[in-house]
Amino acid sequence: MGNNLSVILITKNAERTIETTLKSVSWASEIVVLDSGSTDNTLNIAKNYTSKIFISESWPGFGVQRQHAQNYATNDWILMLDADEQISEPLKNSILQAIKGPDCIYEINRISIAFGTVIKHSGWFPDWIMRLYPSKLTKYDDALVHEKLIVPDGMACKKIEGLLIHE
């Protein structure tokens, strides 16, 4: 596919949502799945979209697991997703434009949906999260939970158009 983008997912027992997620990023050059020991159909579903599936049953926490997964990626750009998130078409188009430009960390507006309703209160909307970034210049911190992308000094951060849908 030649767009220099690696999409990364860390998973465990995500059979209910992972196919929708993978369909939404099937246009990416590379999809990397790092699984933490799923006992459901997660891995069989993932095999329909990528051969880059790795297993790490030890659980060092979200930050370290994301770092581990990033080590398997081979492209210049990383899009880090959860197994219950999908890329909207406008976001896809924005990503494809962004990765043609200079190195920058991009913040994506994530909308969270619960029981069929977009959550627009309690700080959940807008929910700008850093998920698109140059693979060689940054990574996630070591946090067990609520991990954050490390922003190098002088690195530009920009907002990108389109929505990341979290169900």
Predicted segment positions?
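Active-site acidic short loop of glycosyltransferases
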Residues: G2, W27, S51, A73-D76, ...
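A conserved acidic beta->alpha catalytic loop
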Residues: E15, S24, D35-N44, S58, ...
